[in-house]
A protein has these predicted regions:
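N-terminal, cleavable Sec-dependent signal peptides of secreted/periplasmic/extracellular proteins
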Residues: 1-167
């Protein structure tokens, strides 16, 4: 059963629906089945790029795919502690020109291994967010790209070629 929910204003909504049809199909009785979900109604898209020495947040509009100027941006952990706040520039970019704490040192969110940043963007009348670990649908393995779990300070690649060794 698919149905639209008439949420007319931007915001983050927590919704509970009662479905008699699902109740009779899933519960085997004539009573409603309750389904809870959340819905984000927004015209903002928030993009996060974490770096070791600096990071950035890019905010764009969904309807025009244009940068959003002067959006208020906050970077928080799951305890709600603010690690950075600022505004986007003319290109819709908020430049975080300082190292953020390593994700491994953040307080956990839902499980002991689940640590992430929660980044919000606000404009007059609109709000959106992104978590630093959201990658559903763009996982590297889907595109046959190699991945690894190294978080150290240095990464080196060796190039070995016979012509290089002959010198």
């Amino acid at each position: 059963e698919v149905m639209g929910i008439p949420l007319k204003e931007p915001g983050f909504y927590v919704v509970e629906l009662a479905s008699p049809r699902l109740g009779s199909a899933l519960l085997g009785a004539e009573r409603p089945y309750y389904v809870q979900t959340t819905a984000l109604v927004t015209n903002l898209s928030v993009h996060l790029k974490l770096g070791r020495e600096a990071s950035l947040v890019w905010v764009t509009s969904l309807d025009k795919a244009q940068p959003v100027v002067a959006a208020a941006v906050e970077v928080r952990d799951c305890d709600g502690r603010v690690h950075w706040k600022g505004k986007t520039d003319a290109q819709g970019i908020a430049r975080i020109e300082q190292p953020l704490p390593n994700v491994a040192t953040l307080p956990y969110c839902f499980r002991n291994w689940d640590r992430k940043y929660f980044v919000t963007a606000r404009t007059d009348g609109d709000f959106s967010f992104v978590f630093s670990d959201w990658n559903e649908g763009i996982n590297p393995w889907r595109f046959h790209l190699p991945t690894g779990g190294y978080n150290g300070p240095f990464l080196a690649t060796s190039v070995m070629d016979r012509t290089l060794l002959r010198a």
